[in-house]
């Protein structure tokens, strides 16, 4: 683990550089019978993983290119001081980590590596693992530098590490040369013609036109970290039923919209033939949280001059031409950000038919269903617009900016990354087996929520981690 790993520096893409210098930090919890043997397998697995992907042992390094006025980032071989600590740290605890057969004892930040913020002016590790060995189990704390890896890439690395922990893993499916070539491909994916899209409202300048003098304070922005989180569980079957009900209602809403607003522009009149479960789930959350934030007057409804804005991650790997590999580790997620008037979130009247003899609860149920459907339809339209042209437009904007730009999360009332697709709970680590639970650290800001990875097994519920500021 202490060997120096060499690789050629990898230049990061504009999408990597539009990410703040923070770490994605999570904790995986395992119930283990033979802890010593599991730790030995883990050490071998980490060493094998770094041999296959040596850049994971490196650092994110900031620099300025000749003739350029803005900071750039690249992945470089580790410094001697950083490498001496090793990528994997093992800490032994002479106590139990499990409260009962299913629940683990509360953890703390001492169980995960690194701090949430990387120091931009200094080389910062790309990847670190901390193994906490207990009498009855192991918890693995991971830290991934977000400039180098997005959440999808994080899931790929965890699955790959699990594969290397099992005895005699097959040849690696991941290739360092592909990582380098793909980041260059993204950098070259400029728009061939003017798209007419303005991204300036979504990104903010993160520094002065020239780097600060040596020894001066860094100008990079910080992110407020929430001090409280709450986890909510939603049955998968209930969400599937809600999605199907919304899809059935789409033609009715489309017809009603055309009748009430015959002069709508083309994007607003575009039919949405289907909705994903994620669309409907985010719509449900957006409706509930917006109505909690705004007071509704009995006569006038919600305030007509207020808007609520959401941003949600859209994985662009399969949406661009040529498509990127699903196993690409770098940042390939763009934030979809748009706002709606808060009156969109009131109960929607969906029919003019007589309601005589109809139960009032059924009427109210249908009206709220229509509201959720209407919001989900707006979300799906936004996601559908995230295509190859949009991707190239964003890359061009970031490349042409005279200074570094970061996506402006502060403009959003709600921020929704979805990790549902990550196969973390499916990762078999050999002696450790599959993770029993997962904890996410550093959920930023009030109104930020994360849709957690799907548990192993059929009909796994949807889990939501909601970030709240203390009152």
From Swiss-Prot:
The keyword Transferase applies. Disruption phenotype: Impairs the production of deacetyl astellolides A and B and leads to the accumulation of dideacetyl astellolides A and B. Keywords: Acyltransferase, Transferase. It is an enzyme of class 2 (transferase). It holds the Pfam family Transferase. Induction: Expression is regulated by the secondary metabolite regulator cclA. It catalyses: dideacetyl astellolide A + acetyl-CoA = 14-deacetyl astellolide A + CoA; dideacetyl astellolide B + acetyl-CoA = 14-deacetyl astellolide B + CoA. This is O-acetyltransferase astG. It comes from Aspergillus oryzae (strain ATCC 42149 / RIB 40) (Yellow koji mold).
């Amino acid at each position: 683990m202490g060997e120096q790993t060499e690789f050629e520096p990898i230049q990061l893409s504009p999408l990597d550089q539009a990410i703040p210098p923070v770490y994605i930090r999570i904790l995986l919890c395992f119930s283990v019978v033979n802890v010593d043997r599991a730790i030995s397998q883990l050490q071998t697995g980490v060493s094998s993983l770094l041999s296959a992907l040596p850049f994971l042992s490196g650092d994110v390094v900031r620099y300025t290119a000749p003739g350029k006025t803005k900071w750039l980032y690249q992945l470089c071989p580790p410094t001697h001081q950083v490498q001496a600590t090793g990528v994997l740290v093992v800490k032994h605890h002479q106590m139990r980590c499990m409260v009962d057969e299913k629940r683990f004892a509360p953890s703390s930040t001492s169980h995960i590596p690194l701090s949430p913020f990387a120091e931009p002016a200094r080389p910062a590790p790309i990847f670190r693992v901390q193994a906490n060995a207990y009498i009855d189990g192991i918890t693995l704390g991971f830290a991934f530098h977000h400039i180098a890896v997005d959440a999808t890439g994080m899931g790929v690395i965890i699955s790959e590490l699990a594969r290397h922990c099992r005895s005699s893993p097959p040849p690696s499916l991941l290739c360092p040369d592909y990582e380098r070539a793909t980041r260059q491909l993204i950098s070259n994916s400029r728009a061939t013609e003017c798209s007419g899209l303005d991204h300036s409202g979504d990104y903010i300048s993160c520094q002065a036109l020239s780097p600060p003098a040596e020894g001066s304070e860094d100008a990079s922005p910080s992110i407020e970290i929430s001090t409280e989180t709450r986890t909510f569980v939603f049955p998968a079957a209930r969400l599937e039923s809600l999605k199907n009900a919304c899809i059935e209602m789409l033609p009715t809403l489309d017809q009603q919209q055309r009748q009430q607003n015959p002069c709508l522009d083309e994007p607003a009149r575009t039919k949405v033939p289907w909705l994903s479960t994620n669309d409907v789930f985010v719509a449900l959350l957006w409706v509930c949280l917006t109505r909690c934030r705004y007071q509704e007057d009995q006569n006038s409804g919600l305030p007509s001059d207020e808007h609520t804005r959401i941003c949600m991650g859209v994985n662009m790997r399969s949406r661009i031409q040529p498509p990127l590999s699903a196993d690409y580790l770098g940042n390939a997620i763009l934030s979809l950000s748009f706002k709606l008037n808060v009156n969109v979130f009131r109960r929607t009247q969906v029919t003019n038919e007589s309601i005589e003899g109809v139960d009032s609860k059924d009427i109210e149920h249908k009206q709220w269903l229509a509201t959720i459907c209407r919001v989900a339809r707006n979300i799906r339209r936004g996601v559908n617009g995230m295509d190859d042209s949009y991707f190239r437009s964003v890359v061009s904007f970031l490349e042409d900016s005279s200074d570094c730009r970061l996506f402006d999360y502060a403009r959003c009332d709600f921020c929704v990354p979805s990790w549902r697709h990550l196969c973390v709970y499916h990762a078999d680590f050999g002696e450790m087996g599959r993770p029993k639970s997962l904890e996410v650290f550093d959920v930023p800001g009030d109104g930020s929520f994360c849709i957690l990875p799907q548990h192993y097994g059929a009909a796994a519920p949807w889990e939501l981690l909601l970030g709240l500021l203390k009152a």
